């Protein structure tokens, strides 16, 4: 019973989003932060972007990311951190719409997006992080 209610709320939020959207490309190799369990330096860098305070719906609109050289190990989520709101300490974004609140009185706040893996070097593909403003 609870899942249909949550799905209905997310669907309602998605249907009330503005026409303008922001798309950010996440690269499975270049934007991969290597897991702290694996010795050695971190592999890639996060993607930084700024959003004005407000409510957003985020999802992966396209995704071809995989690990182990594309041999079936699908990477189906990206992490979003920052914004002084609901993603302040991090949230996971998949193909399912996720509501993210960006708070503060600042005109724009920085958020970062990345994936994590224990071995980033064999990752391939990209995903598009779609960000839509909720009216």
Predicted regions mapped to residue ranges:
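Hydrophobic helical h-region of N-terminal Sec-dependent signal peptides
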Residues: 6-11
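N-terminal signal peptide c-region/cleavage motif recognized by signal peptidases
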Residues: 15-17
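Acidic, Ser/Thr/Pro
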Residues: 20-135
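Positively charged n-region of N-terminal signal peptides that target proteins for export
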Residues: 1-4
């Amino acid at each position: 019973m609870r899942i249909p209610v949550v799905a209905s709320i997310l669907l309602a939020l998605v249907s009330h989003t503005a026409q303008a959207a922001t798309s950010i490309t996440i690269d499975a190799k270049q934007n991969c932060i290597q897991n702290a369990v694996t010795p050695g330096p971190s592999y890639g860098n996060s993607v930084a972007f700024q959003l004005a305070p407000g409510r957003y719906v985020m999802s992966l609109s396209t995704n071809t990311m995989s690990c182990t050289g594309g041999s079936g190990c699908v990477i189906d989520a990206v992490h979003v951190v920052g914004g002084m709101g609901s993603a302040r300490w991090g949230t996971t974004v998949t193909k399912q719409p996720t509501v993210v609140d960006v708070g503060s009185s600042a005109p724009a706040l920085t958020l970062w997006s990345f994936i994590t893996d224990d071995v980033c070097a064999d990752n391939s593909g990209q995903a598009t992080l779609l960000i839509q403003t909720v009216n």
